[in-house]
Amino acid sequence: MNQAVIVAAKRTAFGKYGGTLKHLEPEQLLKPLFQHFKEKYPEVISKIDDVVLGNVVGNGGNIARKALLEAGLKDSIPGVTIDRQCGSGLESVQYACRMIQAGAGKVYIAGGVESTSRAPWKIKRPHSVYETALPEFYERASFAPEMSDPSMIQGAENVAKMYDVSRELQDEFAYRSHQLTAENVKNGNISQEILPITVKGEIFNTDESLKSHIPKDNFGRFKPVIKGGTVTAANSCMKNDGAVLLLIMEKDMAYELGFEHGLLFKDGVTVGVDSNFPGIGPVPAISNLLKRNQLTIENIEVIEINEAFSAQVVACQQALNISNTQLNIWGGALASGHPYGASGAQLVTRLFYMFDKETMIASMGIGGGLGNAALFTRF
């Protein structure tokens, strides 16, 4: 079986909903990343077999194809857009790696993009062609049958209650995320991930959701979103805009082209869980991944779990017995933001730049009751 390696990874800084990137469509968010790869790796871009991108709430059409054409890549390069909800970016990386393993191609660009600010309004079509009632707008499509389709906030509350994750633990984890993110912005770790872009004449190179200046005590002052609950705006991620791209190729070709380090894809697992508890998906996904590869949690140096809500990450940490020295050691989405279709690719990008780590996992809890996890080693 061929081996797939990730040899380059970049992302935009993540804008908050209605923030600096609010006027950019998904293909426009991706354009500078494609152009960066095109300029830096011209001998590789000409060999691309496919572009695979994750997206959830985009503007329609095949965004992967639209984006590569918008960026001036060759007409002969195909593109495919994947929707596994907020796991789409991680799914796109695994898809490209699996295609290489299977011998279907040797060079892929994978990643994800989301503009929550430019997400189209959705209107349900009336049953009658003579409908006179006003259109009914809705926030999102359903993830599961009506009785098992909680809002993401309610899903987080369900997890918090079932796994006994207190408000205090949630706030403490959120504070940790902001502090670790700020620390790794300051020391330059996170800046490695980000490609600065020019937006309306200004350089944009910093995630807008980070609030490192908020004192720890302030997290406890936020009111629960649902009366009587524990999930608040402070211990939940924000809606965000942003894009991520990774260059993935067959290992022997990577060496031939002069790439000397990166991530080797080892395996990936996707599982289903009760859709009322979507955030707990990483638990069986990571457990199955470890078992299949004859590993234990102690064998993994770093585990990146997407921080949609403190409640679900803390529950996963406790259930899997993950130490603080393993989990989200540069912070996470509670601070940096969660551009849905890009977030999974962002987790892998973060692992890519942890050059001193050898064995790593990226994992997502996904709306509709899914869990996804991927195993990487350094090459």
UniProtKB/Swiss-Prot annotation:
Listed CDD domains: thiolase
GO biological process, one term: phenylacetate catabolic process
Record-linked InterPro entries: Thiolase, Thiolase-like, Thiolase-like_sf_Thiolase, Thiolase_C, Thiolase_CS, Thiolase_N
SUPFAM superfamilies assigned to the protein according to its UniProt record, in alphabetical order: Thiolase-like (SSF53901)
Keywords: Acyltransferase, Transferase
Coiled coil: none
Residues at the active site: C86 (acyl-thioester intermediate), H338 (proton acceptor)
Tagged with keyword Transferase: yes
E.C. designation(s): 2.3.1.-
GO cellular component: cytoplasm
GO MF terms, alphabetically ordered: acetyl-CoA C-acyltransferase activity
Note, other: May contribute to vancomycin resistance.
Family: Belongs to the thiolase-like superfamily. Thiolase family.
PANTHER family: 3-KETOACYL-COA THIOLASE, PEROXISOMAL (PTHR43853), ACETYL-COA C-ACETYLTRANSFERASE YHFS-RELATED (PTHR43853:SF3)
Identification of the protein by name: Putative acetyl-CoA C-acetyltransferase VraB
Native organism taxonomy: Bacteria, Bacillati, Bacillota, Bacilli, Bacillales
Gene that encodes it: vraB
